[in-house]
């Protein structure tokens, strides 16, 4: 395997986390309160529990205080909103994260929108997403932010490039499309209703897949020397962790590619930590 083709998100994320650790050590040296994140989990979804565990470990490694509040999935929407409002009003909490998905009886959008903008570490509230669309932003949703940071680290040109995104979620596809447009890329967003998907993916200079289907993108769907960013985290038929891209099948054709694991995932966590530190500095008016 030609390792020069690998876009190493784990390595880049460690560089980012080292800088954050350095800044938090300076905060500790001044005997000041360190950045604090509160994560809310409803129920015991296994995937959510794993994601939260990874976030908590990452926080502790860089010196961020991370508290997880777990409530049963019978909690009412009004009770959850009250909990969030209490956190909104707590000056010692810099960032709030509600782990999705939520139970069906709870309106996820209403709950997320309860988080005040200056504590919305995921960047999902309307004000943050609206500013992103206008090109005015200090904070970005974690996964799109991590992807852009990864592309910048590897000096991958965006201006004038045709970027095809598979997936139009509010969490990845839509905000990422806006970021790429702001970087002067030509962007095509494909989704479940796109006809003849391969016609679009075969035109991509950069292909980004966030569709959530194991090994969905095959070699026949891409052109030679494409750069591939795999956002998917899935399990294949043997229960092995894999992305949306059929990695081994496409590897000989690509110019560069992110692996799963070790690509976008670590960058999402690193971007989340950057967002927590940003909100802390805002809260402390540093």
Curated annotation (Swiss-Prot):
Pathway: One-carbon metabolism; tetrahydrofolate interconversion. It holds the Pfam family THF_DHG_CYH. InterPro entries: Aminoacid_DH-like_N_sf, NAD(P)-bd_dom_sf, THF_DH/CycHdrlase, THF_DH/CycHdrlase_cat_dom, THF_DH/CycHdrlase_CS, THF_DH/CycHdrlase_NAD-bd_dom. Gene3D superfamilies: Leucine Dehydrogenase, chain A, domain 1, NAD(P)-binding Rossmann-like Domain. GO terms for cellular component: cytosol. One of its GO terms (biological process) is methionine biosynthetic process. The keyword Cell inner membrane does not apply. Keywords: Amino-acid biosynthesis, Histidine biosynthesis, Hydrolase, Methionine biosynthesis, Multifunctional enzyme, NADP, One-carbon metabolism, Oxidoreductase, Purine biosynthesis. Its EC number is 1.5.1.5, 3.5.4.9. It comes from the Bacteria. It catalyses: (6R)-5,10-methylene-5,6,7,8-tetrahydrofolate + NADP(+) = (6R)-5,10-methenyltetrahydrofolate + NADPH; (6R)-5,10-methenyltetrahydrofolate + H2O = (6R)-10-formyltetrahydrofolate + H(+). NADP(+) binds at residues 167-169, 192, 233. GO terms for molecular function: methenyltetrahydrofolate cyclohydrolase activity; methylenetetrahydrofolate dehydrogenase (NADP+) activity. Belongs to the tetrahydrofolate dehydrogenase/cyclohydrolase family. Homodimer. Catalyzes the oxidation of 5,10-methylenetetrahydrofolate to 5,10-methenyltetrahydrofolate and then the hydrolysis of 5,10-methenyltetrahydrofolate to 10-formyltetrahydrofolate. This is Bifunctional protein FolD.
């Amino acid at each position: 395997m030609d390792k020069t083709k690998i876009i190493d998100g784990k390595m880049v994320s460690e560089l980012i986390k080292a800088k954050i650790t350095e800044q938090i050590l300076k905060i500790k040296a001044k005997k000041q309160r360190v950045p604090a994140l509160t994560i809310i989990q409803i129920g015991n979804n296994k995937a959510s529990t794993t994601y939260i565990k990874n976030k908590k470990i990452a926080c502790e490694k860089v010196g961020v205080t991370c508290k997880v509040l777990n409530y049963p999935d019978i909690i009412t929407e009004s009770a959850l909103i009250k909990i969030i409002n209490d956190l909104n009003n707590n000056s010692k909490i810099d960032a709030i994260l509600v782990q999705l998905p939520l139970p069906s009886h709870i309106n996820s959008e209403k709950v997320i929108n309860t988080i005040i903008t200056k504590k919305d570490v995921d960047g999902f509230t309307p004000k943050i997403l609206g500013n992103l669309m206008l090109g005015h932003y200090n904070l970005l949703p974690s996964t799109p932010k991590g992807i852009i940071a990864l592309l910048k680290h590897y000096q991958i040109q965006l201006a004038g490039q045709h970027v095809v995104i598979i997936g139009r979620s509010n969490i990845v596809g839509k905000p990422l499309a806006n970021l790429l447009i702001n970087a002067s890329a030509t962007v095509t967003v494909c989704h479940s209703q796109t006809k003849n998907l391969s016609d679009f993916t075969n035109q991509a200079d950069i292909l980004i897949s966030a569709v959530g289907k194991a090994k969905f993108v095959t070699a026949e769907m891409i052109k030679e020397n494409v750069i591939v960013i795999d956002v998917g985290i899935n399990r294949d038929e043997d229960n092995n962790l894999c992305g949306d891209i059929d990695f081994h099948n496409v590897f000989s054709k690509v110019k560069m590619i992110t692996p799963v694991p070790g690509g976008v995932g670590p960058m999402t966590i690193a971007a989340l930590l950057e967002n927590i530190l940003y909100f802390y500095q805002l809260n402390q008016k540093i």
